[in-house]
A protein has these predicted regions:
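Rossmann-like AdoMet
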Residues: 2-129, 149-239, 247-320, 337, ...
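Conserved S-adenosyl-L-methionine
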Residues: 244
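Long, intrinsically disordered low-complexity tandem-repeat segments
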Residues: 129-150
């Protein structure tokens, strides 16, 4: 048996009566519990030789994981492999439930039945205003069995969870349909929740609105314009683009500062500026444009697919001096890959709701258990209008999202198979990433971010640059130092972006990619990516 410590041993959580418990102390309890299982005859010791225990620390209070989960591995044809993993989220798991949870997980590895397990997760609460059986005391859910990992149908028992879809790579999962619905129906969600989506962020607002960060960004851009003007290379029209506009506050503050600096220096750049706001959500664009105030005459809004800005903005190819992207890449489709003992696997997930959540939905909305997957599909297709009453449709959507969980399994990737490689990259690029990675690793393949990045670079003027504010993993080794998502936001999701992958994409396009810490707020997880063109 191999135990993986996927977090700093000094990480702490609040224990009972206000005490602090470290990751190391909690890990010690896991080892003690594991040691008792063979003594109690609750595990076949022959299974331990291929078992891996992963000790995680999922920092997102809302997420898609139960405290203890089982992962099995299959080959490309779907046949069971020997590799097995038990993953434990030490931030959620209750100490007194640890031994029975591990016993259930061990039995599930060799069982073809779904075994009950006591919940809920430690500290988990339903979203505000949502009655959620997923967080009810004494709720029970099931540990996925070996049969479940192979994709066998979920048992129809009233005590079992309800699968909402088949196993698929993360990039093809239902999560992205929920995400798309959220951004298309943002106004409906905010009305139902009673707060703007920014309130779901850890600090209640985005770091991109920090005034000093904006002032420095404006100063850097103004300096570039001055240098180009000194060389008689400044275009008559100065194009700048912001992708991922949020409420529009950041763009408004940036334009306020740019105009003030321009007037102070008498440089007359503001009158030549053409500022474009691009976003996926029409409602977001309308809100952002209304925020522009006196800058509206120089601002245009463009609805675009964030994965392919070039498709909409092709008229700006090689013309844009400044592109700013904020909090977009962490909300684009990705895969997760795993390397174990030199073999590569893709993580496949199956969305489900627990038996307790299913019972609540059946009772609250007057539907049959067997109708749940179909009704969720209809919700994702047409929105809350899947119900005759809009408010009930919204309540159903919010309750399903609050209770949504993911089963996981590992599907082996055959040598030479490139179906998991993002467009624009090759197996060689992935091999280069893995060469710089720890031997055993689980990491994001940020497909959507890589495509968006590659489809933004052609917009840049030869002296232009791209600046991205997001949560990045700049080096592959950092994937062993903490959980990088996905986390669950209020209606949406977030995952850290593989910065090492973007560095490879940039190199292919002739750009160096740099990462700088966001120094304007202590403790911020945000990193600033910026590009420089190679000579």
């Amino acid at each position: 048996m191999i135990v993986h410590f996927n977090q700093s041993l000094q990480t702490t959580r609040a224990g009972r009566e206000g005490s602090r418990e470290t990751f190391a102390e909690l890990a010690g309890r896991v080892v003690e519990s594991l040691a008792t299982l063979p003594q109690q005859g609750q595990v076949d010791v022959r299974t331990l030789s291929t078992l891996r225990i992963h000790l995680d620390w999922i920092q997102y209070r809302a997420n898609f994981r139960d405290p203890v989960i089982v992962r099995r591995a299959i080959d490309a044809q779907g046949r069971m492999l020997a590799l097995a993993e038990i993953a434990i989220d030490l931030r959620q798991v209750e100490a007194e439930r640890l031994t029975p949870l591990l016993a259930d997980a061990q039995r599930a590895l060799g069982s073809h039945a779904r075994l009950p397990r006591v919940g809920p997760a430690r500290g988990r609460r339903p979203a505000a205003g949502i009655p959620s059986a997923a967080a009810a005391p004494g709720a029970t859910v099931g540990i996925p069995s070996a049969a479940a990992a192979l994709g066998a149908p979920v048992a129809p028992s009233e005590n079992g969870p309800v699968a909402l879809d088949d196993f698929r790579p993360l990039r093809d999962g239902l999560l992205w349909e929920f995400n798309r619905l959220f951004w298309h129906r943002l106004a409906d969600w905010e009305a139902a929740s009673g707060r703007r989506f920014e309130a779901a962020l850890p600090t209640g607002k985005s770091d991109v609105e920090h005034p000093q960060a904006i002032a420095d960004s404006v100063g850097d851009f103004w300096t570039l314009l001055r240098e180009l003007e000194a060389r008689s290379q400044l275009p008559a029209e100065i194009f700048a683009v912001e992708i991922g506009v949020g409420s529009g506050t950041r763009a408004r503050l940036w334009l306020d500062r740019f105009k003030a600096l321009d007037e102070q220096c008498g440089s007359a750049y503001y009158s030549r500026l053409k500022f474009l706001l691009g976003d996926f959500s029409p409602r977001t664009l309308d809100t952002a444009l209304a925020t522009m105030g006196p800058h509206a005459p120089i601002v245009s809004v463009v609805a675009m697919d964030a994965v392919n800005p070039l498709k909409t903005l092709s008229f700006l190819r090689f013309k844009t001096l400044y592109v700013h992207v904020s909090n977009v890449y962490d909300n684009l489709p990705f895969d997760e890959l795993v390397r174990r003992d030199g073999r590569l696997y893709v993580v496949e997930t199956r969305p489900y709701v627990s038996a307790a959540t299913a019972r609540h939905l059946v009772t609250e909305f007057g539907i049959a258990r067997t109708e749940l997957p179909g009704l969720v599909r209809r919700l994702l297709s047409v929105g809350p209008e899947a119900f005759d009453d809009h408010d009930r449709g919204m309540a159903f959507w919010r309750c399903v999202w609050a209770g949504l969980r993911l089963e996981e399994r590992l599907r082996a990737i055959d040598n030479g198979d490139d179906g998991h490689v993002p467009p624009g990259l090759t197996l060689q690029h992935l091999d280069d990433l893995l060469d710089a990675a720890p031997y055993d690793i689980r990491f994001h393949l940020s497909r959507g971010a890589a495509e968006s990045f590659a489809n933004t670079l052609p917009l840049l003027h030869p002296r232009g640059y791209l600046q991205v504010q997001d949560i990045f993993v700049p080096a592959m080794d950092e994937y062993r130092q903490g959980f990088k998502g996905p986390g669950k936001l209020d209606g949406s999701l977030v995952a850290w972006v593989n910065g090492a992958l973007l560095r490879a994409v940039g190199a292919r396009a002739g750009y160096d990619v740099h990462f700088a810490p966001f120094r304007y707020r202590p403790g911020s997880k945000v990193t600033i990516l910026f590009t420089t063109q190679r000579d």
